[in-house]
Amino acid sequence: MAFLLNTLKFLLWIIRHNEIDTINLYNSITPYIQIATGGNGNMLNFGYWGHNKKTEYMNPMQAQEELSALIGKFGDFQLSHRIIDAGSGFSAPAAQWKSSYDFLDIVCVNINSQQLSTASKALVPLIATTTGFNIINANINNGNVSTADATRQPVTSEMCGNIISLVNATATTLPFADECVDRVVALESAQHFKPLQHFFKESARILKPGGLLIIAMPVMIGSTDGKINWSPFIHQFRKLGILYFSWASEHYTLDSIESSLKSEGIKIEDIQHIGHYVYEPLANYYIQNRKLLKKTIKDNLSSYVQVMSFEIVENIIYRSALKMKNLSQKAIIDYVLIKCEKI
Protein backbone atom coordinates (compact mmCIF):
# COMPACT_ATOMS: atom_id res chain seq x y z
CA MET A 1 0.00 0.00 0.00
CA ALA A 2 2.80 2.43 0.90
CA PHE A 3 4.44 1.70 -2.45
CA LEU A 4 1.24 2.52 -4.36
CA LEU A 5 0.59 5.68 -2.35
CA ASN A 6 4.12 6.97 -2.83
CA THR A 7 4.02 6.29 -6.56
CA LEU A 8 0.59 7.91 -6.94
CA LYS A 9 1.71 10.95 -4.97
CA PHE A 10 4.76 11.39 -7.18
CA LEU A 11 2.71 11.06 -10.37
CA LEU A 12 0.18 13.62 -9.13
CA TRP A 13 2.98 16.10 -8.43
CA ILE A 14 4.18 15.70 -12.01
CA ILE A 15 0.76 15.92 -13.65
CA ARG A 16 -0.71 18.83 -11.66
CA HIS A 17 2.53 20.85 -11.30
CA ASN A 18 1.06 23.70 -9.27
CA GLU A 19 3.40 25.65 -6.95
CA ILE A 20 3.02 23.29 -4.00
CA ASP A 21 3.42 20.22 -6.21
CA THR A 22 6.58 21.68 -7.72
CA ILE A 23 8.01 22.32 -4.24
CA ASN A 24 7.18 18.77 -3.14
CA LEU A 25 8.60 17.28 -6.34
CA TYR A 26 11.92 19.11 -6.05
CA ASN A 27 12.24 18.35 -2.34
CA SER A 28 11.61 14.68 -3.12
CA ILE A 29 13.97 14.18 -6.06
CA THR A 30 16.83 16.51 -5.11
CA PRO A 31 18.54 14.03 -2.72
CA TYR A 32 18.71 11.46 -5.53
CA ILE A 33 20.06 14.04 -7.97
CA GLN A 34 22.74 14.93 -5.46
CA ILE A 35 23.64 11.27 -4.93
CA ALA A 36 23.93 10.76 -8.69
CA THR A 37 26.18 13.82 -9.06
CA GLY A 38 28.50 12.97 -6.20
CA GLY A 39 26.56 14.25 -3.22
CA ASN A 40 27.36 17.96 -3.54
CA GLY A 41 25.41 19.09 -6.58
CA ASN A 42 23.29 22.11 -5.66
CA MET A 43 22.50 23.37 -9.14
CA LEU A 44 19.13 22.46 -10.58
CA ASN A 45 19.35 23.03 -14.33
CA PHE A 46 19.86 21.00 -17.49
CA GLY A 47 23.33 22.42 -18.08
CA TYR A 48 25.04 23.82 -21.15
CA TRP A 49 27.29 21.31 -22.84
CA GLY A 50 28.72 23.72 -25.42
CA HIS A 51 30.10 22.75 -28.79
CA ASN A 52 33.81 22.16 -28.29
CA LYS A 53 36.03 19.20 -27.53
CA LYS A 54 36.12 19.64 -23.76
CA THR A 55 32.36 19.08 -23.50
CA GLU A 56 32.82 15.47 -24.60
CA TYR A 57 34.21 14.79 -21.12
CA MET A 58 31.78 16.95 -19.13
CA ASN A 59 29.61 15.72 -16.30
CA PRO A 60 26.27 17.32 -15.37
CA MET A 61 27.74 19.50 -12.61
CA GLN A 62 30.29 20.99 -14.98
CA ALA A 63 27.60 21.59 -17.60
CA GLN A 64 25.41 23.31 -15.01
CA GLU A 65 28.26 25.61 -14.05
CA GLU A 66 28.80 26.36 -17.75
CA LEU A 67 25.16 27.39 -18.11
CA SER A 68 25.38 29.59 -15.04
CA ALA A 69 28.53 31.26 -16.40
CA LEU A 70 26.86 31.73 -19.77
CA ILE A 71 23.98 33.56 -18.10
CA GLY A 72 26.43 35.96 -16.48
CA LYS A 73 27.96 36.82 -19.84
CA PHE A 74 24.65 36.92 -21.70
CA GLY A 75 23.12 39.14 -19.02
CA ASP A 76 26.02 41.63 -19.01
CA PHE A 77 26.53 41.13 -15.28
CA GLN A 78 29.79 43.07 -15.49
CA LEU A 79 27.67 46.19 -16.09
CA SER A 80 25.22 45.40 -13.32
CA HIS A 81 25.02 46.15 -9.62
CA ARG A 82 21.85 44.66 -8.13
CA ILE A 83 20.31 41.37 -9.34
CA ILE A 84 17.14 39.53 -8.43
CA ASP A 85 17.53 35.78 -8.98
CA ALA A 86 13.91 34.61 -9.24
CA GLY A 87 13.43 30.92 -8.49
CA SER A 88 16.95 30.65 -7.13
CA GLY A 89 16.94 27.00 -6.01
CA PHE A 90 19.85 26.38 -3.63
CA SER A 91 21.48 29.70 -4.67
CA ALA A 92 24.42 27.88 -6.27
CA PRO A 93 24.26 30.05 -9.42
CA ALA A 94 24.19 33.17 -7.21
CA ALA A 95 27.30 31.98 -5.38
CA GLN A 96 29.05 31.39 -8.71
CA TRP A 97 28.05 34.83 -10.00
CA LYS A 98 29.23 36.44 -6.76
CA SER A 99 32.60 34.74 -7.14
CA SER A 100 32.92 36.00 -10.73
CA TYR A 101 31.45 39.47 -10.13
CA ASP A 102 32.26 40.25 -6.50
CA PHE A 103 30.72 43.74 -6.68
CA LEU A 104 27.21 42.35 -7.21
CA ASP A 105 24.35 42.62 -4.76
CA ILE A 106 22.28 39.48 -5.39
CA VAL A 107 18.85 38.79 -3.95
CA CYS A 108 17.75 35.15 -4.22
CA VAL A 109 13.97 34.81 -4.33
CA ASN A 110 12.50 31.35 -3.81
CA ILE A 111 9.05 30.14 -2.77
CA ASN A 112 10.66 26.94 -1.45
CA SER A 113 11.71 27.71 2.12
CA GLN A 114 13.44 24.33 2.48
CA GLN A 115 15.77 25.15 -0.40
CA LEU A 116 16.49 28.57 1.09
CA SER A 117 17.35 27.02 4.43
CA THR A 118 19.80 24.66 2.70
CA ALA A 119 21.19 27.58 0.70
CA SER A 120 21.86 29.62 3.84
CA LYS A 121 24.04 26.80 5.20
CA ALA A 122 25.79 26.15 1.88
CA LEU A 123 26.72 29.81 1.42
CA VAL A 124 28.35 30.23 4.83
CA PRO A 125 31.80 28.82 3.83
CA LEU A 126 32.06 31.40 1.06
CA ILE A 127 31.96 34.30 3.50
CA ALA A 128 35.55 33.65 4.59
CA THR A 129 36.88 33.59 1.02
CA THR A 130 34.98 36.44 -0.65
CA THR A 131 35.54 40.10 0.18
CA GLY A 132 32.43 41.99 1.24
CA PHE A 133 30.26 38.90 1.20
CA ASN A 134 27.40 38.64 3.68
CA ILE A 135 24.10 36.81 3.96
CA ILE A 136 20.72 38.15 4.95
CA ASN A 137 18.05 35.52 5.56
CA ALA A 138 14.60 37.01 5.13
CA ASN A 139 11.48 35.07 6.13
CA ILE A 140 13.12 31.64 5.78
CA ASN A 141 11.18 30.18 8.68
CA ASN A 142 7.98 32.16 8.24
CA GLY A 143 6.35 30.42 5.31
CA ASN A 144 5.65 32.11 2.01
CA VAL A 145 5.48 35.89 1.73
CA SER A 146 1.88 36.89 1.14
CA THR A 147 0.76 39.49 -1.37
CA ALA A 148 -0.20 41.77 1.51
CA ASP A 149 3.18 41.43 3.20
CA ALA A 150 4.95 42.08 -0.08
CA THR A 151 2.93 45.27 -0.52
CA ARG A 152 3.38 46.50 3.05
CA GLN A 153 7.08 45.78 3.47
CA PRO A 154 8.94 46.08 0.16
CA VAL A 155 12.69 45.60 0.11
CA THR A 156 14.16 48.99 -0.73
CA SER A 157 17.52 50.08 -2.10
CA GLU A 158 18.62 51.22 1.37
CA MET A 159 18.25 47.65 2.67
CA CYS A 160 20.64 46.23 0.08
CA GLY A 161 24.41 46.30 -0.06
CA ASN A 162 27.28 44.20 -1.38
CA ILE A 163 25.59 40.99 -0.25
CA ILE A 164 23.65 37.87 -1.09
CA SER A 165 20.16 38.02 0.39
CA LEU A 166 17.71 35.13 0.66
CA VAL A 167 14.02 36.01 0.41
CA ASN A 168 11.13 33.55 0.71
CA ALA A 169 8.54 34.84 -1.77
CA THR A 170 6.74 33.97 -4.98
CA ALA A 171 8.09 35.32 -8.26
CA THR A 172 4.63 36.47 -9.28
CA THR A 173 4.44 38.94 -6.35
CA LEU A 174 7.96 40.22 -5.84
CA PRO A 175 8.38 42.04 -2.48
CA PHE A 176 10.57 44.85 -3.80
CA ALA A 177 10.18 48.57 -4.35
CA ASP A 178 9.60 50.02 -7.81
CA GLU A 179 12.65 50.52 -10.04
CA CYS A 180 15.17 49.21 -7.50
CA VAL A 181 17.21 46.68 -9.53
CA ASP A 182 19.01 46.56 -12.87
CA ARG A 183 18.73 42.82 -13.53
CA VAL A 184 16.03 40.22 -12.98
CA VAL A 185 17.19 36.69 -13.77
CA ALA A 186 15.14 33.51 -14.11
CA LEU A 187 17.57 30.64 -14.72
CA GLU A 188 15.42 27.67 -15.66
CA SER A 189 12.67 28.69 -13.27
CA ALA A 190 10.21 30.82 -15.25
CA GLN A 191 8.52 27.72 -16.68
CA HIS A 192 7.19 27.06 -13.16
CA PHE A 193 5.74 30.55 -12.62
CA LYS A 194 1.94 30.68 -12.80
CA PRO A 195 0.75 32.90 -14.30
CA LEU A 196 3.96 33.79 -16.14
CA GLN A 197 2.46 37.13 -17.18
CA HIS A 198 2.45 38.23 -13.52
CA PHE A 199 6.19 37.57 -13.29
CA PHE A 200 6.79 39.71 -16.37
CA LYS A 201 4.63 42.49 -14.94
CA GLU A 202 6.47 42.39 -11.61
CA SER A 203 9.86 42.34 -13.36
CA ALA A 204 8.90 45.42 -15.36
CA ARG A 205 7.82 47.15 -12.15
CA ILE A 206 11.02 46.58 -10.15
CA LEU A 207 13.51 47.06 -12.99
CA LYS A 208 15.08 50.46 -13.48
CA PRO A 209 14.66 51.98 -16.96
CA GLY A 210 17.19 50.26 -19.18
CA GLY A 211 17.39 47.30 -16.80
CA LEU A 212 17.44 43.78 -18.19
CA LEU A 213 15.26 40.72 -17.70
CA ILE A 214 17.29 37.58 -18.42
CA ILE A 215 15.46 34.28 -18.92
CA ALA A 216 16.77 30.77 -19.57
CA MET A 217 14.02 28.21 -20.04
CA PRO A 218 12.68 25.24 -22.01
CA VAL A 219 10.07 26.10 -24.63
CA MET A 220 7.94 24.50 -27.29
CA ILE A 221 8.38 25.72 -30.84
CA GLY A 222 5.28 26.72 -32.80
CA SER A 223 1.76 27.18 -31.52
CA THR A 224 -0.60 25.50 -33.97
CA ASP A 225 -0.97 22.44 -36.15
CA GLY A 226 -1.91 24.10 -39.41
CA LYS A 227 -5.59 25.02 -39.43
CA ILE A 228 -6.65 22.26 -37.05
CA ASN A 229 -8.19 23.70 -33.89
CA TRP A 230 -6.70 21.30 -31.36
CA SER A 231 -7.40 21.87 -27.67
CA PRO A 232 -4.24 22.89 -25.77
CA PHE A 233 -4.05 19.50 -24.03
CA ILE A 234 -4.38 17.44 -27.21
CA HIS A 235 -2.03 19.71 -29.13
CA GLN A 236 0.71 19.54 -26.50
CA PHE A 237 0.27 15.83 -25.81
CA ARG A 238 0.53 15.02 -29.53
CA LYS A 239 3.80 16.92 -29.70
CA LEU A 240 5.40 16.03 -26.38
CA GLY A 241 4.18 12.51 -25.68
CA ILE A 242 5.51 11.33 -22.31
CA LEU A 243 7.23 14.69 -21.82
CA TYR A 244 3.81 16.27 -21.43
CA PHE A 245 3.66 14.60 -18.01
CA SER A 246 7.33 14.19 -17.05
CA TRP A 247 8.30 17.73 -18.07
CA ALA A 248 7.12 18.94 -14.68
CA SER A 249 6.34 22.53 -15.58
CA GLU A 250 4.14 24.63 -17.82
CA HIS A 251 4.68 24.08 -21.53
CA TYR A 252 5.09 27.60 -22.90
CA THR A 253 5.67 28.30 -26.56
CA LEU A 254 8.26 30.85 -27.58
CA ASP A 255 5.56 32.79 -29.46
CA SER A 256 3.43 33.15 -26.33
CA ILE A 257 6.42 34.28 -24.25
CA GLU A 258 7.38 36.93 -26.80
CA SER A 259 3.79 38.19 -26.90
CA SER A 260 3.54 38.37 -23.11
CA LEU A 261 6.81 40.28 -22.79
CA LYS A 262 5.81 42.85 -25.38
CA SER A 263 2.44 43.39 -23.70
CA GLU A 264 4.29 44.47 -20.53
CA GLY A 265 6.40 47.02 -22.38
CA ILE A 266 9.53 44.88 -22.24
CA LYS A 267 11.67 45.03 -25.37
CA ILE A 268 13.30 41.80 -26.52
CA GLU A 269 16.96 42.50 -27.28
CA ASP A 270 18.25 39.01 -28.07
CA ILE A 271 17.15 35.38 -28.19
CA GLN A 272 19.68 32.57 -28.36
CA HIS A 273 18.58 29.04 -29.22
CA ILE A 274 20.81 26.52 -27.42
CA GLY A 275 18.56 23.44 -27.24
CA HIS A 276 20.98 21.26 -29.21
CA TYR A 277 23.67 21.99 -26.60
CA VAL A 278 21.33 21.21 -23.71
CA TYR A 279 18.90 18.38 -24.35
CA GLU A 280 20.81 16.06 -26.65
CA PRO A 281 24.13 15.87 -24.76
CA LEU A 282 22.29 15.59 -21.44
CA ALA A 283 20.19 12.72 -22.78
CA ASN A 284 23.31 11.06 -24.19
CA TYR A 285 25.05 11.34 -20.83
CA TYR A 286 22.14 9.74 -19.02
CA ILE A 287 21.77 6.93 -21.56
CA GLN A 288 25.49 6.16 -21.51
CA ASN A 289 25.74 6.23 -17.71
CA ARG A 290 22.32 4.83 -16.86
CA LYS A 291 23.51 1.59 -15.24
CA LEU A 292 26.05 3.33 -13.02
CA LEU A 293 23.62 6.07 -12.00
CA LYS A 294 20.93 3.52 -11.13
CA LYS A 295 23.34 1.48 -9.04
CA THR A 296 24.65 4.57 -7.24
CA ILE A 297 21.16 5.65 -6.24
CA LYS A 298 19.84 2.18 -5.39
CA ASP A 299 22.81 1.58 -3.10
CA ASN A 300 21.52 4.48 -1.00
CA LEU A 301 17.93 3.23 -0.75
CA SER A 302 17.04 1.47 2.47
CA SER A 303 13.73 -0.27 1.76
CA TYR A 304 12.06 -2.45 -0.84
CA VAL A 305 9.33 0.17 -1.28
CA GLN A 306 11.91 2.83 -2.09
CA VAL A 307 13.61 0.57 -4.62
CA MET A 308 10.35 -0.31 -6.36
CA SER A 309 9.25 3.33 -6.48
CA PHE A 310 12.63 4.33 -7.84
CA GLU A 311 12.48 1.69 -10.60
CA ILE A 312 9.17 3.11 -11.84
CA VAL A 313 10.32 6.71 -11.68
CA GLU A 314 13.68 5.92 -13.28
CA ASN A 315 11.97 4.17 -16.19
CA ILE A 316 9.89 7.31 -16.76
CA ILE A 317 13.04 9.42 -16.65
CA TYR A 318 14.81 7.15 -19.13
CA ARG A 319 11.93 7.20 -21.60
CA SER A 320 11.67 10.95 -21.14
CA ALA A 321 15.36 11.37 -21.93
CA LEU A 322 14.92 9.44 -25.18
CA LYS A 323 11.87 11.54 -26.07
CA MET A 324 13.62 14.78 -25.13
CA LYS A 325 16.52 13.99 -27.44
CA ASN A 326 14.16 13.08 -30.27
CA LEU A 327 12.03 16.23 -29.91
CA SER A 328 15.12 18.43 -29.76
CA GLN A 329 16.47 16.90 -32.95
CA LYS A 330 13.10 17.53 -34.61
CA ALA A 331 13.06 21.15 -33.36
CA ILE A 332 9.79 20.61 -31.48
CA ILE A 333 11.34 21.73 -28.19
CA ASP A 334 14.13 24.21 -27.64
CA TYR A 335 16.02 25.87 -24.82
CA VAL A 336 16.27 29.62 -25.13
CA LEU A 337 18.14 32.49 -23.55
CA ILE A 338 16.11 35.69 -23.72
CA LYS A 339 17.48 39.15 -23.02
CA CYS A 340 14.89 41.89 -22.57
CA GLU A 341 15.16 45.58 -21.71
CA LYS A 342 12.71 47.68 -19.75
CA ILE A 343 11.94 50.66 -21.93
What residue ranges belong to the model's regions?
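Conserved alpha-helix/loop element of class I SAM-dependent methyltransferases that forms part
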Residues: M61-L79
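A short acidic, Gly/Pro-enriched loop at the edge of an enzyme's catalytic core
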Residues: T172-V184
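Conserved class I S-adenosyl-L-methionine
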Residues: I214-K239
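N-terminal auxiliary segments of SAM/dcSAM-dependent transferases
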Residues: M1-T37
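Class I SAM-dependent methyltransferase SAM/SAH-binding core
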Residues: R82-A128, G132, I136-N139, T156-T173
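A short SAM/SAH-binding and catalytic strip from SAM-dependent methyltransferases
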Residues: R183-P195
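A short glycine-rich, Lys/Arg-flanked "PGG" loop and its adjoining helix->strand segment in the class I
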Residues: Q197-L212
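Substrate-binding/catalytic lobe of Class I Rossmann-like enzymes that use SAM or dcSAM, i.e.
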Residues: I228, L240-L327
